[in-house]
Amino acid sequence: MASAFSKLLTGRNASLLFTTLGTSALTTGYLLNRQKVSADAREQHKLFPPSADYPDLRKHNNCMAECLTPTIYAKLRNKMTPSGYTLDQCIQTGVDNPGHPFIKTVGMVAGDEESYEVFADLFDPVIKLRHNGYDPRVMKHPTDLDASKITHGQFDERYVLSSRVRTGRSIRGLSLPPACSRAERREVENVAITALEGLKGDLAGRYYKLSEMTEQDQQRLIDDHFLFDKPVSPLLTCAGMARDWPDARGIWHNYDKTFLIWINEEDHTRVISMEKGGNMKRVFERFCRGLKEVERLIQERGWEFMWNERLGYILTCPSNLGTGLRAGVHVRIPKLSKDPRFSKILENLRLQKRGTGGVDTAAVADVYDISNIDRIGRSEVELVQIVIDGVNYLVDCEKKLERGQDIKVPPPLPQFGRK
């Protein structure tokens, strides 16, 4: 069972811990060290006005750079979350990485659940900009994991080669990867694998620690799209998520390798359902069933996932808030991908394209990774249905082009209107 003591060792529970347990050497040392770090940071900030610390964002093209102003920076610079995470730590990855040539990146991360509250003056407009107008100050996020509502979930497998649905989940009471200590990261691993040992039937499997894999085993899993890549992404390195690699990282998968859990990469956990072929309905059904069972097993052991009604499920990057869901397929569309209307068709269908191997990769043999753009403001069922309908439209366009027929750009999908 997960350690209850480690759950108490968080900033928001510090005073309660002193009262309840007294000031033992262990608790005093742990908590006073965090307080000292926070105090040192505050004193350092006092040496200079906020204007002297304001980052140079004149050549930047990310959501953080577009939303951050000197006024917001001055208001938030000296604030900290209960665990000591600062605004400058939130935005450092966006300062170090001005932008991406194909995708407008977010440019900031959260260090803990409270980051989204303490620094809401910046996070809220960034979320609204990134998520198609979703306003977390007035809107509520819907959740729906009823896979029976999905329709037309079988793709033409002459075009669709594989189907996949993933999401992330964070364990409440532990810092997120940019800010977690080694002990917290190891506790995430312990909580996750202890719960996953309870999975039965077609979900049953085993855990593989990254530190115990050979380089060859790791690369084979990466090449087969089962395992996360090595920590070379600027998001990971500049945000501090690659610290102590590969300590307490790993992958759990069922014996069929169709249900997988990544542990301690960008998020505490990434839950993935995948298989070859075009049966997205079956992939989503297994995803929903497995995710619900994982949450039940986590709760049985006294833990819970980070969630609130404004932001949905809380994850490290604001781009994944809400559902955290990315439903995608590998689809071969040689004619459509060369059509000048392709990008506009994707935009109106609320889809995005990546190369065969993901972001920053080329499309091999005209095979693209097509997935939903949105994460928040629509439920899991809605997003998967958008992908199904959209990919079917793309395949239909490809068939028309093969026959020499014209294709049309579809009208834009209606904006969500959740209160």
Swiss-Prot record:
Lineage of the species this protein comes from: Eukaryota, Metazoa, Chordata, Craniata, Vertebrata
Functional description taken from the UniProt entry: Reversibly catalyzes the transfer of phosphate between ATP and various phosphogens (e.g. creatine phosphate). Creatine kinase isoenzymes play a central role in energy transduction in tissues with large, fluctuating energy demands, such as skeletal muscle, heart, brain and spermatozoa.
Residues modified to Phosphothreonine: T356
Catalyzed reaction equations: creatine + ATP = N-phosphocreatine + ADP + H(+)
Name recorded for this polypeptide: Creatine kinase S-type, mitochondrial
Membrane topology: Peripheral membrane protein
Location of the transit peptide in the chain: 1-39
Record: residues binding ATP: 162-166, 225, 270, 326, 354-359, 369
Keyword Cell division set for record: no
UniProt keyword annotations, A-Z: ATP-binding, Kinase, Membrane, Mitochondrion, Mitochondrion inner membrane, Nucleotide-binding, Phosphoprotein, Transferase, Transit peptide
